[in-house]
Regions:
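Exported/periplasmic ABC-transporter solute-binding proteins
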Residues: 1-133
Length: 133
């Protein structure tokens, strides 16, 4: 749901690239009105569970959520969107230390870790584009 998650704008771009404004309208207006497009607050957690319990047939999620769903034994399949629809190179993650962090030393350690080659290897293993300095 674009009202709750910025990632929805990238998903809408993918729909648009796949089928134009007609597809966006079909999914986000017609099917939403009919109750067959379900909005989410935390799509990457809600969507795999909806698929597993039969409330949904398909939905966009992070690659890590496919892994997580499988680790829980959920019967879920993965479909890659393909290079022309892939949005990974357009998405940014922001990690920062709060000025009022209760444990600023731990925040700093996490920031140092997330920039490390070990952490970047984890990102790459799950199909994410590693951090660019």
């Amino acid at each position: 749901d674009p009202a709750n998650e910025d990632i929805a704008y990238h998903i809408l771009d993918m729909y648009r690239d796949a089928g134009g404004e007609h597809l966006v309208h079909r999914i986000m207006e017609e099917k939403r009105t009919a109750g067959t497009t379900m909005m989410t607050v935390v799509h990457h957690r809600e969507t795999p569970l909806r698929i597993a319990d039969g409330a949904a047939d398909v939905g966009p999620v992070w690659a890590t959520e496919i892994h997580h769903a499988r680790s829980l034994g959920l019967p879920i399949d993965e479909v890659q969107p393909g290079a022309t629809l892939d949005q990974r190179d357009r998405i940014n993650y922001f990690i920062c230390r709060l000025k009022t962090a209760l444990h600023p030393e731990n925040a700093q350690k996490f920031l140092e870790f997330i920039l490390s080659s070990a952490a970047q290897a984890v990102y790459a293993r799950y199909g994410f584009i590693p951090h660019r300095a």
